[in-house]
Amino acid sequence: MSAVARRVGMFVSRSVCPRACLAVLVAVLAFAQPALAQSRVPSERGLEALVKATLLTFNDANVTGNFTVFHAKLAKPFRQQFTPERLQETFKSFVEQQIDFDAIAAYKPVYDPAASVDGDGRLLVKGHFPTEPTRVLFDLAFIPSDGEWKLISIHVKTERAPQP
């Protein structure tokens, strides 16, 4: 039982109005659930969708040179630190080299190590897509914001896929 449920449970057990208190307990637990969910790594499908959506939005920004949509999907602290123009300058080499890795949409990411939530509540996701001849490597960090994971850090690079 969570600390919130224990505290609310104590309140309910001492109360003279069990129905009203039960409603309060249900309401508190309903609002606590998203916060609890944000402290866990998403399901395999959810994590794959998060990684692909992040990297494909980043790829679109690089291909088009327009970082506005990518910027809008960042966590607030990241958005405040990096304007769309600064993002474009930061990833200038991707834009200049015309790096396009939209092929990742057809592949499952390989996580190394497994995704985890650190002590600060950040979702850390590192790995690669087994694309050939060039492999896409990523190191992403997300924070909970408005009930969903929002990007706070991104490192992406491409390299030649290892030959068997």
Give the positions of each predicted feature:
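Short solvent-exposed beta->alpha transition segments
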Residues: 41-53, 68-122
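Short helix-adjacent coil turns
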Residues: 58, 62-69
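Bacterial N-terminal signal peptides
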Residues: 20-32
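A broad structural signal for short, well-ordered beta-strand segments within beta-sheet-rich domains
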Residues: 1, 98-101, 148-151
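N-terminal secretory signal peptides that target proteins for export/translocation
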Residues: 1-18
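Exposed beta-sheet edge and beta->alpha loop/turn motif
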Residues: 109-164
